[in-house]
A protein has these predicted regions:
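N-terminal (or domain-start) structured segment
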Residues: 20-110, 148, 156, 172-199, ...
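N-terminal export leaders
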Residues: 1-12
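An extracytoplasmic/periplasmic, membrane-proximal ligand-sensing/linker region
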Residues: 25-27, 169-173, 258-319
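N-terminal signal peptide c-region/cleavage motif recognized by signal peptidases
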Residues: 15-17
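Hinge/capping helix and adjacent helix->loop/strand transition within the periplasmic-binding protein
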Residues: 78-84, 99-185, 234, 247-280
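A ligand-binding cleft/hinge motif common to bilobed small-molecule-binding domains
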Residues: 92-102, 168-170, 197-231
């Protein structure tokens, strides 16, 4: 390449480098594509508070619900890739949504992964009176009654529904799906004896487990949950490699300067070493993760074929 052209490129890149070095010098907006309340909103706000302290500028949580998350995501994509507008998203938005809904953007192409902040473990629960105390025992019981037993989910096409379909396929089982409007509503009916099996968030289940009303058989992540360390994984109980994971994390628009991306990710890694942040996350039922950008990107790529298979198994339609 001619020396003059190299010099011109260097001059053009100088303003970008200068902006990255001076960042941040004004408030940062964290768009959360959920309504206020709930675990995903809480994880986003915990992250925003920590980043405010670490970066020395306000990080303002901005709830933008609607379109199953697409409205908030589009708002981030319309913003400059300068680190002043970030997305507090989940695996549902960045992985499942593009498989379920026709979008004007591709999350894996149009966003920069920064950090998986916290995991939201899915847990298989059965009513205490049902009998099984392990996943193999559950498999044997359901296999003896194909298609006769029901399981509840927090809604058709949601992660509790899709995750259960993948689990049933791996176990070689058939059950009837009973969708609810939310996980807590499914848990209410489970505690009332109207449903006996549910795959849902750990936070929705701990009180019922502690009261002896349900039994937790397995978590679907690759490792045990810090929230429920006594509950074994599916893989531990005879199905190696099984993993259905959901998490909340931070992303920016494509083209976010690497220096800014890495500074945010570094701040979040420090968050998971902070006892106060860890306690705050565990209190709301979230496992502290605080991953690197590469780990978040790898998780998105790994989950995509799993969720594509789950959607096909579930019969859910693409809108």
């Amino acid at each position: 390449m001619p020396r003059r052209l190299l010099l011109l490129l260097a001059l053009l890149l100088l303003p970008l480098a200068a902006r990255a070095q001076s960042w941040p010098d004004r408030p940062i907006r964290l768009i959360i594509p959920f309504g206020a309340g709930g675990i995903s909103d809480s994880v986003g706000r915990i992250g925003a508070e920590w980043l405010s302290k670490q970066l020395g500028v306000p990080v303002v949580a901005d709830n933008r619900p609607g379109g199953n998350g697409a409205i908030g995501m589009e708002a981030v994509l319309r913003s400059p890739a300068d680190g002043y507008t970030l997305l507090g998203a989940s695996a549902s938005h960045l992985v499942v949504l593009p498989l379920m809904q026709r979008l004007t953007f591709d999350p894996q192409r149009d966003f920069t992964p920064i950090s998986m902040t916290a995991g939201n473990p899915l847990v298989l629960a059965v009513a205490t009176g049902m009998g099984p105390t392990t996943l193999p025992a559950f498999r044997d019981m359901v296999a003896a009654r194909p298609g006769q037993l029901q399981y509840a989910s927090g809604g058709t096409g949601g992660l509790s529904h899709l995750g259960m379909e993948v689990l049933l396929q791996r176990l070689g089982l058939q059950m009837e799906h009973v969708p609810y409007r939310s996980g807590p509503l499914a848990m209410q009916d489970m505690m009332g004896g109207r449903i006996q099996v549910h795959l849902g968030n750990a936070l929705d289940m701990t009180a019922a487990r502690d009261a002896g009303m349900i039994r937790l058989l397995a978590v679907t992540g690759a490792t045990r949950s810090a929230i429920l360390p006594d509950v074994p994984t599916v893989a531990e109980q005879g199905w190696p490699g099984f993993e259905v994971t959901t998490w909340n994390g931070l992303a920016g628009p494509a083209g976010l300067p690497v220096a800014i991306r890495d500074r945010i990710a570094g701040a979040m890694r420090q968050a998971c070493a902070d006892d106060g942040v860890r306690r705050s996350l565990l209190r709301i039922g979230a496992d502290p993760l605080c991953s690197t950008p590469a780990e978040m990107a790898a998780s998105m790529q790994r989950l995509t074929p799993i969720m594509r298979e789950a959607i096909a198994l579930s019969g859910a339609t693409v809108n």
